[in-house]
């Protein structure tokens, strides 16, 4: 297995290439697989990401830091990084796993990425692993808003409305469709002050509410700036000095 291209993409060259090979080996392939390295890499990754967030976002509290970290190290995030590194091309899978498309499976790719982090840690220590993690994550962090990352649509809508002193939205189930085992819920979300009324659907009430909240948030974010602009214009008009009307009696005296 030629791993030069992968090491180039990682920006790290192993002094013990067998560690990288083991990190890419699924348990379906051989007894010398990557699960122990994955365990180690998971801990190293969490520590390095926590350290990075602590240094980058000095104004975030403990709860927000935990939320952001959880979203950066969850399976989907790791899977996307693994895809960027093209790990599916170099995974070592057993024949059955290979035939079933294991090289595309998010869990397998995410685990392999954690195992690579563990392998780098064993190969050269924590600083080398932290350098790799920073290289992988800094481009991601430059594109996300840590204040909203990981928050669902209902939470974002509620926080946005509260920030502008607007009453919270109202959610109502207006219809359900389908058999009991495959129901679809339809929910309306209303923000009366802004005359917003949208509808969302989902396989559960919660999912439908989230879908409706996302649509409502899009509408609210368009309307609130217009409302604020109009409010400022009205305040400016009221405070602008009005011309003093002429005194009719003074006009008569001047004519005399």
UniProtKB/Swiss-Prot annotation:
GO cellular component, one term: cytoplasm
Cofactor annotation: Mg(2+)
A Gene Ontology BP annotation from the UniProt entry: tRNA processing
Active site positions, chain numbering: 42, 114
Subcellular location per the Swiss-Prot or TrEMBL entry: Cytoplasm
InterPro entries named in the record: dsRBD_dom, RNase_III, RNase_III_dom, RNase_III_sf
Enzyme Commission designation: 3.1.26.3
Pfam families: dsrm, Ribonucleas_3_3
Keywords attached to this entry: Cytoplasm, Endonuclease, Hydrolase, Magnesium, Metal-binding, mRNA processing, Nuclease, RNA-binding, rRNA processing, rRNA-binding, tRNA processing
Subunit structure: Homodimer.
UniProt family annotation: Belongs to the ribonuclease III family.
Protein name as it appears in the record: Ribonuclease 3
Organism expressing this protein natively: Cupriavidus pinatubonensis (strain JMP 134 / LMG 1197) (Cupriavidus necator (strain JMP 134))
Lineage: Bacteria, Pseudomonadati, Pseudomonadota, Betaproteobacteria, Burkholderiales
Gene from which this protein is expressed: rnc
């Amino acid at each position: 297995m030629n791993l030069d291209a992968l090491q180039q993409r990682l920006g790290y060259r192993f002094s013990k290439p067998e560690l990288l090979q083991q990190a890419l080996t699924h348990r379906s392939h051989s007894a010398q697989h990557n699960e122990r390295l994955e365990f180690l890499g998971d801990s190293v990754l969490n520590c390095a990401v926590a350290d990075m967030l602590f240094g980058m976002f000095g104004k975030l509290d403990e709860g927000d830091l935990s939320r952001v970290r959880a979203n950066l190290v969850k399976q989907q995030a790791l899977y996307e990084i693994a895809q960027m590194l093209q790990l599916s091309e170099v995974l070592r899978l057993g024949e059955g796993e290979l035939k079933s498309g294991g090289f595309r499976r998010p869990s397998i790719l995410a685990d392999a990425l954690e195992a690579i982090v563990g392998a780098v840690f064993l190969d050269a220590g924590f600083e080398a692993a932290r350098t790799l993690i920073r290289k992988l994550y800094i481009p991601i962090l430059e594109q996300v808003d840590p204040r909203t990352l990981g928050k669902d649509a209902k939470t974002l809508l509620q926080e946005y409305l509260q920030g502008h002193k607007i009453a919270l939205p109202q959610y109502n189930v207006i219809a359900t469709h389908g058999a009991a085992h495959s129901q679809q819920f339809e929910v309306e979300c209303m923000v009366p002050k802004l005359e917003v009324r949208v509808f969302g659907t989902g396989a559960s009430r919660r999912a439908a509410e989230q879908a409706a909240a996302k649509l409502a948030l899009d509408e609210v974010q368009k309307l609130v700036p217009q409302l604020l602009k109009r409010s400022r214009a009205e305040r400016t008009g009221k405070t602008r000095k009005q011309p003093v009307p002429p005194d009719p009696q003074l006009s008569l005296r001047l004519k005399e």
